[in-house]
From Swiss-Prot:
InterPro entries reported for this sequence: HATPase_C_sf (IPR036890), Heat_shock_protein_90_CS (IPR019805), HSP90_C (IPR037196), Hsp90_fam (IPR001404), Hsp90_N (IPR020575), Ribosomal_Su5_D2-typ_SF (IPR020568)
UniProt protein name: Chaperone protein HtpG
Region (B): 337-552
Organism the protein comes from: Shigella flexneri
Superkingdom, natural source: Bacteria
Region (A): 1-336
GO MF, any single term: ATP-dependent protein folding chaperone
Region annotation C: where it falls in the sequence: 553-624
UniProt-annotated location(s): Cytoplasm
Gene3D superfamilies reported in the protein's UniProt record: 3.30.230.80, 3.40.50.11260, Heat shock protein 90, C-terminal domain, Histidine kinase-like ATPase, C-terminal domain
GO CC annotations, alphabetized: cytoplasm
Keywords in alphabetical order: ATP-binding, Chaperone, Cytoplasm, Nucleotide-binding, Stress response
């Protein structure tokens, strides 16, 4: 062999191989699914390239996958006549993992094998799964359109290095030979291999054939028997497809080992003709928050594969959706650029978006437990929707789930429809609070009056919530109201103050004036409030003022944050406020007011600029 060289695996490959062999062994037969799936992808890519260059078929347009084994040599071979690989492509695809974030992903894996197998499964192990059952793997490949002498040989024992060399290979495509480990003889059994192919590959449009050897007139005659149906699953009638087939097809296109939560298969005819098969995964992909990674549907045009990860058909907040679209209205030579500006694309995107939202609404109604699984995995992504998709805002809002004072649990299970159905007579607004954590939201002094009145408050503690609520202004005709902002409806909820209380409040006017003079420009205003029952003071913001949580979002993003001007509200019935009002010594009065303000700021922001000063001030007042 010419041009032979030995190279070391990228470190992530070594780590993945080790984890995979140990974590996936209990489900080892999936290696055959993965290798056949890769062969199917190679055929799809050849079909696509041949649209503009039919010579790539080299006179052989009947694409297929073939599986054969040699019991004497203990080898299993999977071959295809797809697009094949050049030497550079072999090194890129078989020696490295070209995915950003791989290293941190692998470092996150621990010793929990069940969990590891799920995570590795969604990572998409593909070719490397061969090493689960093989102690050596040999690859012979030639790219379509290359000369026979430009074939490539690759071999590795899956430990630390691999060998690559130039060979002559007459037929294009890729041939992968697995040298099976001791104890893996089941994969040399014709019936066993056939059953695995039927189980995992019935839905693939490409014929999968197994070698048949027969003795005729003293000679061995080799023929090939087709094992799978070889009809693209989405082209079949829905009534003929079993749930098991839908699940296996999902695993094929998503490279996921887990079953999907739900799916929707639709054929649309009329002004636009297309078929869609959309899946909601049961687990978030490891790279869902990686902005560099493309997320999208597989695109077919008239059953011809065009591209993976076509992002144009699904809004970003639905980037977790997996599946495909097969359109009859797009040209076969369509490119990502053409898709970007196409009216057909926009119409398909709108239709598919509505389809997914309807699918999620149905899941929420039919199976609350499954929907809760969805929400735990993808709720944060769906919360991007109200800002991104105004046209579907009401439909998205119905799908949102929140923690609430009604359930007294951190689990986000309350829908806006649930909340509205429980609103008190005369209640006009949907009340909510945003905070850094569920505990901080639940114990906020802003809730005291509402708890006393039995009015439900949504407790929002995800980082995205404050941003989302800037766009989500109402639901079912009811406006949202943050309880940390000054609002007339909140003041109305306070009990009517009797005449004697009003007189007592008038008597506190000089006290309020003293506080204003002391704090000056540090606060926007100082006033008395009847919204508190147990707390001496709170800070709140005007409706047009930036909220505390929004200021934190800006700061976390490294942006300049304008100073939040708070309104300092004091509870006239609280013993500490009364004590401060009765204090004539200006130095001690200042200590009391500063302590009450710091307490209110600490409850609102979770931090103080000078916590040591706060502690000293509190200690001085405790001993005085």
């Amino acid at each position: 062999m010419k041009g032979q060289e030995t190279r070391g695996f990228q470190s992530e490959v070594k780590q993945l191989l080790h984890l995979m062999i140990h974590s996936l062994y209990s489900n080892k037969e999936i290696f055959l699914r993965e290798l056949i799936s890769n062969a199917s992808d190679a055929a799809d890519k050849l079909r696509f390239r041949a649209l503009s260059n039919p010579d790539l078929y080299e006179g052989d347009g009947e694409l297929r996958v073939r599986v054969s084994f040699d019991k004497d040599k203990r080898t299993l071979t999977i071959s295809d006549n797809g697009v094949g690989m050049t030497r550079d492509e072999v090194i890129d695809h078989l020696g490295t993992i070209a995915k950003s974030g791989t290293k941190s992903f692998l470092e996150s894996l621990g010793s929990d094998q069940a969990k590891d197998s799920q995570l590795i499964g969604q990572f998409g192990v593909g070719f490397y799964s061969a090493f689960i059952v093989a102690d050596k793997v040999t690859v012979r490949t030639r790219a379509a359109g290359e000369k026979p002498e430009n074939g490539v040989f690759w071999e590795s024992a899956g430990e630390g290095e691999y060998t690559v060399a130039d060979i002559t290979k007459e037929d294009r495509g890729t041939e992968i030979t697995l040298h099976l480990r001791e104890g893996e003889d089941e994969f040399l059994d014709d019936w066993r291999v056939r059953s695995i192919i039927s189980k995992y590959s019935d839905h693939i449009a490409l014929p999968v054939e197994i070698e048949k050897r027969e003795e005729k007139d003293g000679e061995t005659v080799i023929s090939w028997a087709k094992i799978n149906k070889a009809q693209a699953l989405w082209t079949r009638n829905k009534s003929e497809i079993t749930d098991e087939e839908y699940k296996e097809f999902y695993k094929h296109i998503a490279h996921d080992f887990n079953d999907p939560l739900t799916w929707s298969h639709n054929r649309v005819e009329g002004k636009q003709e297309y078929t869609s098969l959309l899946y909601i995964p049961s687990q978030a992909p490891w790279d869902m928050w990686n902005r560099d990674h493309k997320h999208g549907l597989k695109l077919y045009v008239q059953r011809v594969f065009i591209m993976d990860d076509a992002e144009q058909f699904m809004p970003n907040y639905l980037r977790f959706v997996r599946g495909l679209i097969d359109s009859s209205d797009l040209p076969l030579n369509v490119s990502r650029e053409i898709l970007q500006d196409s009216t057909v694309t926009r119409n398909l995107r709108n239709a598919l978006t509505k389809r997914v939202l309807q699918m999620l609404e149905k899941l929420a109604k039919d199976d609350a437990e499954k929907y809760q699984t969805f929400w735990q995995q993808f709720g944060l992504v769906l919360k991007e929707g109200p800002a991104e998709d105004f046209a579907n805002q009401e439909a998205i809002a119905k799908l949102l789930r929140f923690a609430s004072t009604y359930t007294d649990s951190s689990a986000q299970t309350v829908s806006l429809e649930d909340y509205v159905s429980r609103m008190k007579e005369g209640q006009e607004k949907i009340y909510y609070i945003t905070a850094d954590s569920y505990a901080a939201a639940k114990s906020s002094p802003h809730l005291e009056l509402l708890r006393k009145k039995g009015i439900e408050v949504l407790l929002l503690s995800d980082r995205i919530d404050e941003w989302m609520m800037n766009y989500l202004t109402e639901f079912d005709g009811k406006p949202f109201q943050s309880v940390s902002k000054v609002d007339e409806s909140l003041e109305k909820l306070a009990d009517e103050v009797d005449e004697s209380a009003k007189e007592a409040e008038k008597a506190l006017t000089p006290f309020i004036d003293r506080v204003k003079a002391l704090l000056g420009e540090r606060v926007k205003d100082v006033r008395l409030t009847h919204r508190l029952t147990d707390t001496p003071a709170i800070v709140s913001t005007d409706a047009d003022e930036m909220s505390t949580q929004m200021a934190k979002l800006f700061a976390a993003a490294g942006q300049k944050v304008p100073e939040v001007k708070y309104i300092f509200e004091l509870n006239p019935d609280h013993v500490l406020v009364k004590r401060a009002a009765d204090t004539e010594d200006e130095a001690k009065f200042s200590e009391w007011v500063e302590l009450l303000l710091d307490q209110a700021l600490l409850a609102e922001r979770g931090t103080l600029e000078d916590p040591n000063l706060f502690i000293r001030r509190m200690n001085q007042l405790l001993v005085s």
